[in-house]
């Protein structure tokens, strides 16, 4: 088996939000948390309250001008409360969370999700590294070897994991 000190949860977009939501759930139910979280362009605020939903509306090539079909998709939350921490991790209590690496592009509609969750977690005592990659779009890391920023992001993730697992 594996011990929590050997587990890092990672995800991109909704998966990044789910990684945080899972940690809220584990904490709320008295379970061991992983030793770290890697969240790439995480979707943490399904209430879409952040400033970047407006300021980056036309800048993000993945989401630009598609609010109704992608961001405000009721199929994801149904009739549930978008302020529930298991749906929108931003609204949860981060005290006791493991260290987090959050990566986001400056052109993302979800930029505020990352900035706001990093600030809240940091205020609640969590070690958070947020890296905002200038001019990058939602889940730019998927470009792997095609963009220098993507390469840099994966190197950063590798170093973060090395530190967590070798401390």
For the regions a language model picked out, list residue spans one by one.
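Alpha/beta-hydrolase superfamily serine-hydrolase fold, recognizing
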Residues: 1-167
């Amino acid at each position: 088996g594996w011990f929590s000190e050997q587990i890092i949860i990672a995800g991109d977009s909704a998966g990044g939000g789910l990684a945080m939501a899972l940690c809220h759930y584990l904490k709320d139910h008295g379970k061991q948390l992983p030793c770290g979280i890697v969240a790439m362009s995480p979707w943490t605020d399904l209430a879409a309250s952040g400033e970047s939903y407006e300021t980056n509306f036309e800048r993000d090539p993945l989401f630009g001008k598609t609010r109704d079909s992608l961001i405000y998709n009721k199929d994801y939350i149904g009739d549930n409360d978008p302020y529930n921490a298991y749906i929108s991790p931003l609204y949860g209590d981060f005290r006791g969370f493991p260290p987090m690496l959050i990566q986001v592009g400056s052109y993302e509609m979800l930029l505020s999700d990352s900035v706001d969750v990093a600030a809240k977690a940091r205020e609640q005592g969590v070690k958070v590294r947020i890296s905002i990659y200038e001019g990058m779009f939602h889940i730019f890391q998927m470009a792997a070897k095609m963009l220098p920023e993507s390469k840099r992001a994966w190197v950063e993730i590798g170093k973060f994991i090395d530190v967590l697992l070798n401390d």
